Regions:
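Short, acidic/polar linear motifs in exposed loop/turn regions
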Residues: 43-46, 85, 101
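Buried hydrophobic-core signal for structured, non-transmembrane domains
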Residues: 36-42, 79, 93-98
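Bacterial Sec-dependent N-terminal signal peptides
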Residues: 1-15
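Terminal connector regions
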Residues: 87-116
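Beta-sheet-dominated interaction scaffolds and their linkers
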Residues: 11-39, 43, 114-120
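Surface-exposed binding patches on compact interaction domains or structured appendages
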Residues: 45-76
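Hydrophobic core residues within well-ordered beta-strands of beta-rich domains
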Residues: 34-36, 75, 91, 106
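Short, hydrophobic beta-strand segments
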Residues: 77-85
C-alpha cells in the first residue's frame, strides 16, 4: 500500500504592527487629550479584518480601519487617551485587538505621565 503525503498551505491573514507600545511622555493635565496611531500591515496572503479593538478603560478610545486589508496593505488603529478628571501621574492602558489573523489577539499599550497643573 502506497500512502502519499501532500502538504498544503492554507491562506491566512497575518497582522504585523510597526509598534505595540506608545509612550506619550510627560504632558500637562491642562492638555489631557493625547492621540497616537498604531500602523499595521497584513503580511499574510488573505484579506485581514479587524473584528474589534477594546480598551481597558473608558478614558481610552480606539478607532480602527473597518474595511478588509488586502495582503501587503496597511491599516491603522488610532487611540485617544482623555486624562480629564483623572489623577495626575503615570498611567498604562491596553487595547485588545481581535482579527481574523493567524494570531487572533494582539495587545497594544499606551502610557505616559500626566503632570499636575501648577496653581499660581
Amino acid at each position: 500500500m502506497l500512502v502519499a503525503m501532500v502538504a498544503t498551505t492554507s491562506a491566512q491573514a497575518e497582522i504585523k504592527f510597526d509598534k505595540v507600545v506608545h509612550n506619550f511622555g510627560n504632558f500637562s493635565e491642562k492638555s489631557p487629550v493625547q492621540k497616537t496611531t498604531f500602523t499595521f500591515t497584513n503580511v499574510g496572503n488573505k484579506p485581514l479584518v479587524i473584528n474589534q479593538a477594546i480598551a481597558s478603560c473608558g478614558c481610552t478610545v480606539p478607532s480602527y480601519t473597518k474595511q478588509p486589508i488586502a495582503p501587503g496593505q496597511k491599516g491603522t488603529i488610532t487611540v485617544t487617551y482623555n486624562g480629564k478628571g483623572m489623577f495626575p501621574g503615570h498611567f498604562k492602558k491596553s487595547i485588545t485587538v481581535r482579527s481574523n489573523g493567524n494570531v487572533e489577539m494582539t495587545r497594544l499599550y499606551i502610557e505616559g505621565v500626566m503632570t499636575e497643573e501648577t496653581k499660581q
